[in-house]
Amino acid sequence: MLLAKDSVKCDMLDALERAAEFSGVNVGSFAIMDNHLHVVLQVPASTETIPEREVLRRYCALMGGKAALRLEERICGLRERGDSTTAEAELNRIRARMHDLSQFVKTFKEEFGRLFRKRNPFPGTIWEGRFKSTLVGEAEYLRRCVAYVESNPVRAGLSECAEGYAWNTVGAAKRGNKFAKRCREWLMSVICPSDGDSPQIKNVFLKRIAQISGGKILGSAAFVSNMLLRFSDKVRSRSAAARVVEAIGFASHGWKLAARLRVAA
């Protein structure tokens, strides 16, 4: 399996952190498996123009200090030559990659590909197809969806408990990973753990999540109805296309590796 090595999983976690910081998304949960990745995240809407200093800070988080310095010098050089229009256009090009789900996925894939190829020269395609997404509604559903993601290693037989796995949020946070801790902190700020559900209800819900394919809406009847009404011109049934729902709210994503890489050493 391509991701079987801890060094590759470490690169993937690094890429996820960099891409999230650059894109301005809130990651609440993740599980890096041997041949795919699950992420629960929120893409906050950007209501105001992102300040230039913030653009440079995020660019630095993704590309590193030297690249950010070169960008800043290029912007300053354009302005000194009286070409403020080009300078602003370049900043807007970078802003357009932020607070957007598809752009976040693209950024993440590119960053992981760069890190992976530094260790493992590989000319082929790493990822297979488009990512799959599910729009998640109320905190109750978000909490249970997170439980499903975190328990992936247990169902796969990789660990006896979620906390025992090093490459999901709870396990990485327990081992001191700062990014995983921030993910947990953000998640706890929007949902509160609850033990109100019986094991039977939890099991039924987890099976329901497992059966959901990309592009579905997961939430209460009212939430689903509201989303379908909001996109009534684009949605023909209760199964909403991924491209329709990816711009709003919470989403849970799983990315598959290309078939030929799933059994790679």
Q: Residue spans of the language-model regions?
A:
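Short Pro-Cys-Gly-centered "Cys-loop" motif that presents a nucleophilic cysteine in a tight turn
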Residues: 1-34, 42-265
